[in-house]
Amino acid sequence: MSNFSPREIVSELDRFIIGQKDAKRAVAIALRNRWRRQQLEGQMREEVMPKNILMIGPTGVGKTEISRRLAKLAGAPFVKVEATKFTEVGYVGRDVEQIIRDLVEIAITLVREKRREDVKAKAHLNAEERVLDALVGKTASPVTRDSFRKKLRNGEMDDKEIEIEVSDSGASPNFEIPGMPGANIGVLNISDMLGKAMGGRTKTRKTTVKDSYPILINDESDKLLDQDQIVQEALRVSEDEGIVFIDEIDKIAAREGGSGAGVSREGVQRDLLPLVEGTTVATKYGPVKTDHILFITSGAFHVSKPSDLLPELQGRLPIRVELSALTREDFRRILTETEASLIKQYIALMETEEVKLEFSDDAIDALADIAVDLNATVENIGARRLQTVMEKVLDEISFTAPDKAGATFIIDAAYVKEKIGGLAKNTDLSRFIL
C-alpha cells in the first residue's frame, strides 16, 4: 500500500492527465483515506468505509485514465468493467459478482509477481543448476560442472541449444456445474484437482541457454512459493485495497418515460447495490467481502441524469465529480506536456526508421484548433480526436518513412492544413473520415 500524500498523488496524475483538478483531488483523497484506515486499530478500522465516487463527464476527458493511473500508483488490484456487459441474475449473460472474481484473479497475479521478486536470487541459482544439468548431465564431476559454470557466467554458452523440463501449466479443460449462481463459481479445473495426485505434469522444451533462464527462474520461483499463502494474501489484498472501475454507468440508468429493456437495466443496478454496499462473494479461492473495496463509477450522462439511477445506488456513491469538456488550451497541453504525449510517441516511432520529425508551435496550434472544431461540429469524443487528426496528418510520412532514412520533416501549420484543412471544413466528409 503506497503512502503518497494527496498532493503527491495529484502531481503524479498531472504527468499523464491534463486538467480535471476536481476529479484528481477526489481520487487522491480516496486513496489517502485507504492508507489512513490501515493505520487504525480494531473496531474503528472495520467501521470506516470507502467513499465511492461517481465521475460525470463527456467521453475522452480522462475518466478512465485517472482510475487506471491511480491503481498503478497504489500497486493495488484494479479491474475495469463496462456496466453494459452485465445482465440481471437469471438472465443470460454475466452477473455482477464476476467483477469480484476477476479482481481476485488479478490480485493473485500481483501477489505472485511480488513474491517471485523476493525469491528471485535463490530461483536464479536453482535455474543455473538445471541449465548445467542439461549441458553436462546430472552425473558430471564437480570439476566439469565448475568449468561449465564459469563459461555459463561469462556468456560463452548463451547460444547453445538445450532441452529443459518445465512444469506444464497449459490450459486444461474447465467444467461448469449447471445451476450454480454466476455459472462460474462451479468451475472445476481438472489439473488443480489431479495435479498433486499425479505429481504435476512436465513437458520438454527446446531452447537456447540464454532464453531458458526466464522460463526456469519462473518455474523455480513457483516451487519456492507457498500457493496457499499467495491465495490468502490475494484475498486480503482484494478486500482491503481492491479498486473497481465501472464505466458507462449512465447506460443502465432508466431514462424518464423510457420503456423496453428498463427492467433488465434496473435489475443490474439492484444487483450492484449489495456489491457496492458490502456483501460476501463466493469465489473458487474462498469468500471475498466487498465492504472495503473502492468503487469508482463513471458515465457521460448525455441522455440520462445521475438522478435517474436508483436512489439507493445514488446514496452509495457519495462523492460526485464533474469533469469538464476539453478546451483548445487543453488540447495544446495534451500534445506537448504529458509524459508520453502523442507528438513524443510519433517522433520516437519515426526515429526507428531514422526519420526526424519536428513540430513547430503553429502546427500544434493548428492541430488543437482542428480537434476542437471537429469535436464541436461532428461528435465530441474528447482527447481521442487528436489520435485521428495526427494519424491523418502523418499518414504520408508513415507510409514512405522506410524509403526516407536520414530525412527531416518539419511539420508546420501549412502542412497540417494541406493534409487536413479541406476535410475538416467539409462536415459531411469529416463525419466519415475524422
UniProtKB/Swiss-Prot annotation:
Record has Membrane as a keyword: no
Subcellular location: Cytoplasm
Quaternary assembly: A double ring-shaped homohexamer of HslV is capped on each side by a ring-shaped HslU homohexamer. The assembly of the HslU/HslV complex is dependent on binding of ATP.
Major site of localization recorded for this protein: cytoplasm
Gene name, Swiss-Prot/TrEMBL: hslU
Full protein name: ATP-dependent protease ATPase subunit HslU
MF terms (GO), sorted A to Z: ATP binding; ATP hydrolysis activity; peptidase activity; proteasome-activating activity
Residue numbers binding ATP: I18, G60, V61, G62, K63, T64, E65, D247, E312, R384
InterPro entries in the cross-refs: AAA+_ATPase, ATP-dep_Clp_protease_ClpX, ATPase_AAA_core, Clp_ATPase_C, HslU, P-loop_NTPase
CDD domains, A to Z: RecA-like_HslU
Family: Belongs to the ClpX chaperone family. HslU subfamily.
